[in-house]
Amino acid sequence: MSSCINPSTLATSVNGFKCLPLATNRAAIRIMAKNKPVQCLVSTKYDNLTVDRRSANYQPSIWDHDFLQSLNSNYTDETYKRRAEELKGKVKTAIKDVTEPLDQLELIDNLQRLGLAYHFEPEIRNILRNIHNHNKDYNWRKENLYATSLEFRLLRQHGYPVSQEVFSGFKDDKVGFICDDFKGILSLHEASYYSLEGESIMEEAWQFTSKHLKEMMITSNSKEEDVFVAEQAKRALELPLHWKAPMLEARWFIHVYEKREDKNHLLLELAKLEFNTLQAIYQEELKDISGWWKDTGLGEKLSFARNRLVASFLWSMGIAFEPQFAYCRRVLTISIALITVIDDIYDVYGTLDELEIFTDAVARWDINYALKHLPGYMKMCFLALYNFVNEFAYYVLKQQDFDMLLSIKHAWLGLIQAYLVEAKWYHSKYTPKLEEYLENGLVSITGPLIITISYLSGTNPIIKKELEFLESNPDIVHWSSKIFRLQDDLGTSSDEIQRGDVPKSIQCYMHETGASEEVAREHIKDMMRQMWKKVNAYTADKDSPLTRTTAEFLLNLVRMSHFMYLHGDGHGVQNQETIDVGFTLLFQPIPLEDKDMAFTASPGTKG
């Protein structure tokens, strides 16, 4: 293993930026988030040569190193951990006491949406297996669209084959689906996102429910109940449950579940404790990663690039939120932070000659070549990447006696080469056709790299056959990465075109077909929905070499892309929606009511 060099010790002539005041409250955050990137030219001098470069004028991170180091949570205390373990035992007993199929399905749905399902996987598997094996006994869901849809969604989610024909009884040959019950319509809408290619009934279900949910949003009045119906309809239309990362749903659903009259107090208390305990873990991880970032000197020396450490951590938390994946989150966060810097070099700052040399340096993986040929600012970036990848490979070798250095180097090189293709398109003012753009874009969006990193850092033991499958660019990686690419383009293309970047999928489709931007955007959205049907089929394939954990890493990456780019560029520009979610997920614990705190004095007193 090559020795590591500290990039922070290398000199560079890039000027640093003056940081904005630290934002620690929502009001200050909203003011800072209004700044948008614009294009301008800056002149820099390297090796006595002055080079005119583009600059995106990205704003500094909302949360700096000192703020992250100041984080402190009470939920690391052993008292909370003991209470959580006690509650888990009681919930397991309560699960056994639930015997009616619909009640069992609703309990599973609540466990999933509260972020608790991973604690009760054996119990959930047993219930779903039993329901699937006795599906001919369907009186409990007969003429109940809500129950039928819930069963369909949960069984398909967990890999059980269910025919779309279960919905035939809710259709009329002439008018289609018949239902005016909001609960049933919402449940059917969520189920429709688990459809497969060629399922006409499920496609009709999506069209029917989308139309009615939009109407419910428009016709709702100011009554509290109607306002909540409109909110649920809006959330389902924006982002269905199947497209949401677990932790993102949990924070909202805990708040909703607390207001329900039928809530289970054990579940609610456990969900709050679980959320706050995980948040405390995340804060400690952020402190450590922020220290790493500061030590590299990249944020200080490469002032043209984005410091998006907290956003990078949000990605990693969304991909692998469970506590046992701490190392996976660390590797993913650092990788995404480095990807962000390299992306800015290729998209904005580097000259084409420099980019070709950097690509060659990554291909050679030769430190002497890099130090000899790269300009100063690129040496910083290459050394940070080189050191980190080698340390990652060494850790896995030490822990598992598995040499994955070639695999991870190859994955990084694929990304860098895709970046270079887009840089050449930009410099030659070339607009590719949509399919040509997507074939390169599914790599440049980082999908194959992030999936490979997730697997190598989150799997023990690493299975050679599974790794080789991921490296072969299988269809599931292909289509997942294309969805990621398209969602990114929907959220970022306006800002990036304003900067003069390479055309994105929307512009490629407009150029190719003559369509308006509005039509192009609707086409891209429909493409994503159809691609999800392909992904659904691959994840349900019993013969797939992917483990359930690896498949969830992959799905959660796509889900996080939907969140990050739903309201714009949540990663690069730090839009308000992403900032608010980041604040509540990472820095704002859920208050426990006084009665919930009764266990502090005597953990065994609360039932």
Curated annotation (Swiss-Prot):
SUPFAM superfamilies, sorted: Terpenoid cyclases/Protein prenyltransferases, Terpenoid synthases
Binding locations of Mn(2+) 2: 343, 347
Tagged with keyword Phosphoprotein: no
GO molecular function: (R)-limonene synthase activity; magnesium ion binding
Pfam families for the chain: Terpene_synth, Terpene_synth_C
Enzyme Commission code(s) on record: 4.2.3.20
Required co-factors: Mg(2+); Mn(2+)
Domain statement: The Asp-Asp-Xaa-Xaa-Asp/Glu (DDXXD/E) motif is important for the catalytic activity, presumably through binding to Mg(2+).
Record localization: Plastid, Chloroplast
Main location per the UniProt record: plastid
InterPro entries, per database record: Isoprenoid_synthase_dom_sf, Terpene_cyclase-like_1_C, Terpene_cyclase_plant_C1, Terpene_synth_N, Terpene_synth_N_sf, Terpene_synthase-like, Terpene_synthase_metal-bd, Terpenoid_cyclase/PrenylTrfase
Record's catalysed reaction(s): (2E)-geranyl diphosphate = (4R)-limonene + diphosphate
Presequence positions on this chain: 1-52
Positions annotated to bind Mn(2+) 1: 343, 347
Species in which this protein is naturally found: Citrus sinensis
Summary of the function given for this chain in its UniProt record: Catalyzes the conversion of geranyl diphosphate to (+)-(4R)-limonene. Produces exclusively the (+)-enantiomer. Can use neryl diphosphate as substrate. Has no activity with farnesyl diphosphate.
Binding site for Mn(2+) 3: 488
Binding-site residues, substrate: 343, 347, 485, 488, 504
UniProt protein name: (R)-limonene synthase 1, chloroplastic
GO biological process, one term: diterpenoid biosynthetic process
Activity regulation description: Inhibited by 2-fluorogeranyl diphosphate (FGPP) and 2-fluoroneryl diphosphate (FNPP).
Family of this protein: Belongs to the terpene synthase family.
Residue positions of motif DDXXD motif: 343-347
Gene Ontology terms: cellular component: chloroplast
